[in-house]
């Protein structure tokens, strides 16, 4: 479980990640965000069918749920990494056939994760991640 903050811009971070990380980091970010929602809005998370709590006490997971701005940074990073994943891998194998890559499978919860920002604590001090 990691979040590589190598820039302040989520799009720049995604572009700089190596191929191995771009393939797995979308899922890791999804796990952190899903955990944040499960902690702050368990009923919403259950209705949306979000992933179960994972790595609840990991520093990156704690950071994501501390406030709505941190949470939205994670949402933007997840989207940027997925966009980069699709750009690098426009085709993928499914059932033995090459098909158009429409995104990482963990993106199926993305809209619910965006909507869940309203359940995150609203504090005025964004804890800027430092590269």
Show which residues each predicted segment covers.
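Histidine-centered catalytic micro-motifs
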Residues: 54-62
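Phosphate/adenylate-binding glycine loop and adjacent helical scaffold
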Residues: 1-49, 59, 96
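Catalytic cores of phosphodiester-bond-cleaving enzymes
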Residues: 36, 74-131
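Short active-site loop/helix that positions an aromatic residue
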Residues: 63-68
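Secondary-structure capping and boundary motifs in well-ordered enzyme cores
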Residues: 52-53, 70-73
